[in-house]
Amino acid sequence: MSKIGINGFGRIGRLVLRAAIDKGANVVAVNDPFIDVNYMVYLFKFDSTHGRFKGTVAAEGGFLVVNGQKITVFSERDPANINWASAGAEYIVESTGVFTTIDKASTHLKGGAKKVIISAPSADAPMFVCGVNLDAYKPDMKVVSNASCTTNCLAPLAKVINDNFEIVEGLMTTVHATTATQKTVDGPSGKLWRDGRGAAQNIIPASTGAAKAVGKVIPALNGKLTGMAFRVPTPNVSVVDLTVRLGKGASYDEIKAKVQEAANGPLKGILGYTDEEVVSTDFLSDTHSSVFDAKAGISLNDKFVKLISWYDNEFGYSNRVIDLIKYMQSKD
């Protein structure tokens, strides 16, 4: 397994490291100019959402040592100055949220990185969603995007529905947990005024490109889906509401059967299925991209349905980052 570096040790960076440990992937370096190694230990050890790290973590001689393994720590602001090669890091997770274009993310290559995986949507980098379009990956691609957590939830479900019943058109709403870009109390927020309102006090309508991005990973759905978000005052776990018009009529039971078939088959581990009386906290630290809620969906008639799917927007997504890297490594 090739060695991994992480740029940006925030929510996703830290959880990618947790996911890497769970999956036996080898992280050898972390870069973050705003956090020293002792602070990294603290932030990695204690997590208000996912709980304490169950292994050991310490700082020794400038290294971050997790479960006895030394991880090199850099503190460079400019990705071009990170000497990834000195740590042997070849696949870089770009999780700052800042360097999200091919031009900006490819500066990592100057320090010896071979590939860069952006943990966010990208305006120009090829986007991949595990279980949906990994076969489009080519070894000559240097910079790729793992899309967004919401696209990772929506795309596998949309694929199953479109493959079996044909999506004519659809609208998506994600009821989305709070993220780090929001404000604890009302504050300025550039052009998106509503986004600046207190996260703990409000349900905030917001934009999302997640549904349109599905058209990039499933070309047959290009122009057929769009969506919006409601930001809600919960710390983690979000839920997608996909309302679609179908080309081929189907009962809700037939739809459930096809989703369950995919969840137990080709999309196992990516798409989950539940028929229990679940609520959002039941999905904390769930590793699926998407868990279909059979009891929450509704059907108006055989061609117009509302489908519901849950996702841990932090940890499910972080697991897919590692899965994408593992897939790339198998092809490179």
Curated annotation (Swiss-Prot):
Location relative to the cell: Cytoplasm
Record pathway: Carbohydrate degradation; glycolysis; pyruvate from D-glyceraldehyde 3-phosphate: step 1/5
Annotated InterPro entries: GlycerAld/Erythrose_P_DH, GlycerAld_3-P_DH_AS, GlycerAld_3-P_DH_cat, GlycerAld_3-P_DH_NAD(P)-bd, Glyceraldehyde-3-P_DH_1, NAD(P)-bd_dom_sf
Pfam family, one: Gp_dh_C
Protein residues bound to D-glyceraldehyde 3-phosphate: 148-150, 179, 208-209, 231
GO CC annotation: cytosol; mitochondrion
UniProt-listed NCBIfam families: GAPDH-I
Entry similarity comment: Belongs to the glyceraldehyde-3-phosphate dehydrogenase family.
Subunit comment: Homotetramer.
PANTHER family: GLYCERALDEHYDE 3-PHOSPHATE DEHYDROGENASE, GLYCERALDEHYDE-3-PHOSPHATE DEHYDROGENASE-RELATED
Protein name per UniProt: Glyceraldehyde-3-phosphate dehydrogenase 2
Species for this entry: Drosophila melanogaster
Gene that this polypeptide is encoded by: Gapdh2
